[in-house]
Amino acid sequence: MKMEGTIKSPANYVPLTPISFLDRSAVVYADRVSIVYGSVKYTWRQTRDRCVRIASALSQLGISTGDVVSVLAPNVPAMVELHFGVPMAGALLCTLNIRHDSSLVAVLLRHSGTKVIFADHQFLQIAEGACEILSNKGDKVPILVLIPEPLTQSVSRKKRSEEMMEYEDVVAMGKSDFEVIRPTDECDAISVNYTSGTTSSPKGVVYSHRGAYLNSLAAVLLNEMHSSPTYLWTNPMFHCNGWCLLWGVTAIGGTNICLRNVTAKAIFDNISQHKVTHMGGAPTILNMIINAPESEQKPLPGKVSFITGAAPPPAHVIFKMEELGFSMFHSYGLTETYGPGTICTWKPEWDSLPREEQAKMKARQGVNHLGLEEIQVKDPVTMRTLPADGVTMGEVVFRGNTVMNGYLKNPEATKEAFKGGWFWSGDLGVKHPDGYIELKDRSKDIIISGGENISSIEVESTLFTHPCVLEAAVVARPDEYWGETACAFVKLKDGSKASAEELISYCRDRLPHYMAPRSIVFEDLPKTSTGKVQKFVLRTKAKALVSLSKKGRSKL
């Protein structure tokens, strides 16, 4: 409703964009350190100048509004700068998964219409291979820019084509007085993030300036990142634009500690050296920390908040992290929700619970993130909202300002994902009476044994409490009698011993018998670069195993 005397004008409406975070920090925190990577350091004033020059250079290279610029790099300074430099040129940033091979990168470059690709020296051959594939197929090949190792400039001109540009060449060719291109509509796209990439239908999730702005501020507020935090980059910057924290840390003038290789030793060393206040990562990073050798561990210099997500963390792992002194924040979301879509906000009344119970409460996925207005559990067939009884399982759905614009060049997939005015996550969960969501499984991961649903997450959480278990993943294994049974893939801690029979018995003592695994496979777990276990690989292995019923095992 428009009221008499009110108007919408440039005086009271400016499109929201994370670009404004950098503009402000370059003034307010001009001389504060923005980026640290070994001996390489920049201030916020320097960072903005470099980002403006990158935008200028991209414009000179023919990049204009709506074009796509890709980057294939780990957590290095260039990744921070490109998150601003690219949108300052009016373009979309596409951050590629560093575990992709040349053929998949080529698919994504073609699908996104990438015009320039920045490639870290460690992944240069992959980028060059992708460009060669495009060339051989007659597709337009993007301009390739090399990002050398800033600490050593490890790739010399003699070892590559003289025609290939280097990152610092791009910065140098840009002009510091370039007029930054800002969105005319805050719903304009700022980035595209690929959830998967098959040769038939890669899914490019499109983020808007508005969504990125709102989720960045929400992440800062909800994870208690007060003025000038020091953030250690242990979660991949390429994943959901670093859960929007690349922009969020900028908004409050924080310091980005860049980490190329994530190891337990590097984590403790950097926390100690730089007085880290915040960090994040998947449960695999938590496991790395709690199982680090004593020789690599160091006392925390102060409060270190750890934001975990990407996969449901076992309560036992959260408990161990807090024993080490970390303050845990648990979020849940998807690429389609800009990363975090919920957070398990702590309630004061839980303070009196035993520590183990507190960890269980914190392991729940929680309530909606700020900016994401509503989260429900619905029946995927009737689309009715299910009761908040902590028992009735349905599909988790979202709606709000931090849900993606849609899937790039895939209107049918967008329409399907948004049916009924909600984004359908594909995750199965329950809502508790207090309004908190708890995941039970991915819809494709639920195990149906003898007509009963088995939550792989519950079985995994039980296995994680065994003192010998380092990692565990549970999938369905075909069975002639039951239809499916739980099959656990387990990695034991170094020096530990446990038999399959022991672990099965351990689970049966703590779970209904039908939920306990009927088979255990000991091996390393395949993972994505974001730390998620690749269950599709394990499902294939489980299907290849001989059905237990054929061996005459007990059906009890």
Curated annotation (Swiss-Prot):
InterPro entries: AMP-bd_C, AMP-bd_C_sf, AMP-binding_CS, AMP-dep_synth/lig_dom, ANL_N_sf. Signal peptide: none annotated. Expressed in roots, leaves, stems, flowers and developing seeds. A motif (Microbody targeting signal) lies at residues 554-556. It is found in: Peroxisome. GO terms for cellular component: peroxisome. Keywords: Fatty acid metabolism, Ligase, Lipid metabolism, Peroxisome. PROSITE patterns: AMP_BINDING (PS00455). Its main location: other. GO terms for molecular function: ligase activity. Its EC number is 6.2.1.-. The keyword Manganese does not apply. It catalyses: butanoate + ATP + CoA = butanoyl-CoA + AMP + diphosphate; hexanoate + ATP + CoA = hexanoyl-CoA + AMP + diphosphate; pentanoate + ATP + CoA = pentanoyl-CoA + AMP + diphosphate; 4-methylpentanoate + ATP + CoA = 4-methylpentanoyl-CoA + AMP + diphosphate. It comes from the Eukaryota. One of its GO terms (biological process) is fatty acid metabolic process. Catalyzes the ligation of CoA on butanoate to produce butanoyl-CoA. Can also use hexanoate, pentanoate and 4-methylpentanoate as substrates with a lower efficiency. Belongs to the ATP-dependent AMP-binding enzyme family. This is Butanoate--CoA ligase AAE1. It comes from Arabidopsis thaliana (Mouse-ear cress). The lineage of its organism: Eukaryota, Viridiplantae, Streptophyta, Embryophyta, Tracheophyta.
